[in-house]
């Protein structure tokens, strides 16, 4: 992930609207989704009742799980079709259409922010980080999860520098991230930042037919090899979290 350039928002909308129509958006198993929310609870340290924004909420799976965990959650996504899909699936959850770089929320209106696989969709995430800072209260926390460029599978399949890169199922905007670069962006926005890594998030679906046949092998390796402590920096997902200092 390089710092520079702007997100092509129309391509993001078109891509995810198409996924909403095909109902192929929610790629994680229910157990993997629950594990991500457990990571949010652990890293954010927020109490039940805290107001949390789920940015890049897609069809609202994580927004719903945040609500079930006791938070007052609202989800935002740039895709109107995914928001509509989510409202149908989760009628008791508030989901709205919007741009994470121009959030329709007041200053200091949230205790926490979840960036749902969102940061790696921005060639330059500095404006996104500034908006997260703006809407968080002082002492508020954010947690982001994104594919790790240091993971060999993520690099081979999702990085444009790889000879095996597949454009199927990914947008033109997204790149796997380097943890240090994302941490630096949020640190420069006035956050106290920490980095962790997560394995064991089983996929139920990937868009590429060729890769889909190998999915059980990937899920097995992810749940075994990458759980070893020595493999921590190479786990498939980076967890970036931070506290707004002032």
Where are these regions (language model features)?
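Class I SAM-dependent methyltransferase SAM/SAH-binding core
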Residues: 59-102
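A short acidic, Gly/Pro-enriched loop at the edge of an enzyme's catalytic core
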Residues: 101-112
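A C-terminal cap/extension of S-adenosyl-L-methionine-dependent methyltransferases
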Residues: 157-162, 184, 194-246
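Conserved class I S-adenosyl-L-methionine
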Residues: 1-47, 49-56, 61, 143-165, 207
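A short glycine-rich, Lys/Arg-flanked "PGG" loop and its adjoining helix->strand segment in the class I
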Residues: 126-138
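Acceptor-substrate binding/catalytic loop of class I
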Residues: 164-181
């Amino acid at each position: 992930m390089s710092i520079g350039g702007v997100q092509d928002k129309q391509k993001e909308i078109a891509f995810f609207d198409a996924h909403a129509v095909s109902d192929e958006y929610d790629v994680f198993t229910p157990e993997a989704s629950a594990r991500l929310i457990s990571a949010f609870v652990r890293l954010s340290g927020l109490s039940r009742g805290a107001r949390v924004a789920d940015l890049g909420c897609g069809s609202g799976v994580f927004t719903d799980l945040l609500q079930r965990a006791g938070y007052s959650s609202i989800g935002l996504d740039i895709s109107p079709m995914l928001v509509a899909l989510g409202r149908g699936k989760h009628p008791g959850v508030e989901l709205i259409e919007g741009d994470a770089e121009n959030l329709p929320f007041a200053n200091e209106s949230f205790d926490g922010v979840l960036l749902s696989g969102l940061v790696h969709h921005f060639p330059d995430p500095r404006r996104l980080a500034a908006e997260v800072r703006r809407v968080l209260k002082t002492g508020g926390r954010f947690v982001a999860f994104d594919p790790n460029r240091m993971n060999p599978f993520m690099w081979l399949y999702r990085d444009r520098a790889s000879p095996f890169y597949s454009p199927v199922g990914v947008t033109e905007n997204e790149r796997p991230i380097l943890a240090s670069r994302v941490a630096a962006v949020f640190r420069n926005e006035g956050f106290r930042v920490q980095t962790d890594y997560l394995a064991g998030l089983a996929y139920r679906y990937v868009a590429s037919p060729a890769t889909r046949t190998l999915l059980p092998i990937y899920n097995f390796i992810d749940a075994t090899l990458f759980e070893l402590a020595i493999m921590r920096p190479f786990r498939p997902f980076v967890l970036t979290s931070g506290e707004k200092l002032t």
